[in-house]
Amino acid sequence: MIDLEELRQLTMFAREGTLSKAAEKLHISQPTLSRTMQNLEEVFGVSLFVRGKNKIEFNETGWKAAERAEHLLAEGEEVLRHVREFYKRLHTITVESCAPAPLW
């Protein structure tokens, strides 16, 4: 099962281009991020990266996974926003009054 944090890490790698830059932005170690990327490949059951001597890059499947992950994260944020707005409306008391008008 994939969690939202793994998807967030995948999209950060897509934005930053390197594991070290992405790990720095995420405030995690590079080996931790590398393990997450390996875990995602295992969960998906496909290769997401082209690995070089000291470099890792997305292959086409990896770019597609990152694109979809971005959409899922945005949708997750939208769900949070809607639920919070609903809760506020449910627990908001509206008081209306009418000020008396002068009679002269």
Describe the role of every protein-language-model region.
Residues E6-F13, A65:
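Short alpha-helical "packing" element that flanks the helix-turn-helix/winged-helix DNA-binding module
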Residues T11-S29:
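Short helix-boundary/capping micro-motifs
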Residues E16, K25, N39-S47:
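Residue cluster at the C-terminal edge of the helix-turn-helix DNA-binding motif
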Residues T18-L19, M37, R51:
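Helix-turn-helix DNA-binding elements, focusing on the entry/boundary residues of the two helices
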Residues E41-W63:
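A short LG(V/I)-centered, amphipathic sequence patch enriched
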Residues V43-F44, A65-Y87:
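Alpha-helical linker/hinge and terminal dimerization helices associated
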Residues E78-R81, K88-W104:
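N-terminal winged-helix
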